[in-house]
């Protein structure tokens, strides 16, 4: 595990769902990551939060699916030197996603990581459809890293391993995976979180797949 991700501010479909712990949570998150010797990534929802993010030395800023076309937000992070994970909007085309990245790059920040997190289709059995095809397309169209979020794509913990394997086989450079020591007690996204033991097992499987393809994802 290279980086710790957590949401101090949580964009939720319902205003009555848990919205995160705010700036206090960001401080606790920073402290926990420092104790573990890990950098942090967290989602930026509002340009008014940016100063606090910089004060807490957020290592990587995440632009979530709902903010992919928040152009003022994209312009602001484009002025920084902080790496940005740009998640695909749930109904966004590849072209729209690429143009969102251009908003960031046009400000001078080329430290952009694309994250495929599933798109909305007519299917209702699972949350979203992980667009594995997007991985080789982005690899062809850009020189930038591409990662996937199998947790939000399927929305269920039992889907995470299969989607992760598909993503690595298709050429993804990394994963964003929800993990919790006791998923049933998680305040949000409990259904899609896997345990630390399951994550360790998954990483061994993914390393084996990558090795077959002549890649090393262990570094």
Predicted features and spans:
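Electropositive phosphate-/nucleotide-binding environments in soluble metabolic enzymes
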Residues: 19, 23-26, 47, 71, ...
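Conserved structured catalytic cores and adjacent interaction surfaces
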Residues: 53
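Glycine-rich, proline-tolerant flexible connector loops at the mouths of alpha/beta enzymes
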Residues: 5-24, 180-191
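C-terminal alpha-helical cap/extension of soluble enzyme domains
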Residues: 155-219
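Catalytic alpha/beta core domains of metabolic enzymes, predominantly
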Residues: 80-179
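Catalytic beta/alpha-barrel core
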Residues: 5, 19-21, 38-50, 59-71, ...
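Alpha-helix-loop-beta-strand connector modules within alpha/beta enzyme cores
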Residues: 18-42, 76-83, 132-147, 192-215
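Active-site cofactor/substrate anionic-group-binding motifs, chiefly glycine-
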Residues: 1-10, 26-34, 40-41, 60-61
């Amino acid at each position: 595990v290279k980086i710790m991700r957590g949401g101090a501010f949580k964009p939720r479909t319902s205003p009555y769902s848990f919205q995160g712990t705010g700036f206090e949570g960001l401080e606790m998150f920073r402290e926990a990551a420092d104790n573990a010797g890990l950098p942090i990534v967290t989602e930026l929802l509002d340009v008014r939060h940016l100063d606090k993010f910089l004060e807490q030395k957020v290592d990587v800023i995440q632009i979530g699916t709902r903010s992919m076309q928040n152009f003022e937000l994209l312009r602001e992070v484009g002025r920084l030197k902080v790496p940005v994970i740009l998640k695909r909007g749930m109904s966004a085309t590849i072209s729209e996603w690429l143009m969102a990245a251009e908003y960031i790059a046009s400000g001078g920040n080329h430290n952009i990581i694309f994250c495929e997190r599933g798109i909305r289709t007519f299917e209702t059995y699972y949350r979203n459809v992980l667009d594995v095809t997007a991985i080789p397309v982005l690899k062809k169209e850009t020189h930038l890293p591409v990662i996937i979020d199998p947790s939000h794509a399927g929305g269920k913990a039992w889907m995470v391993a299969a989607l992760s394997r598909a993503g690595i086989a298709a050429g993804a450079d990394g994963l964003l995976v929800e993990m919790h020591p006791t998923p049933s007690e998680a305040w949000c996204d409990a259904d899609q979180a896997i345990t630390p033991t399951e994550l360790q097992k998954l990483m061994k499987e993914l390393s084996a797949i990558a090795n077959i393809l002549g890649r090393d994802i262990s570094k």
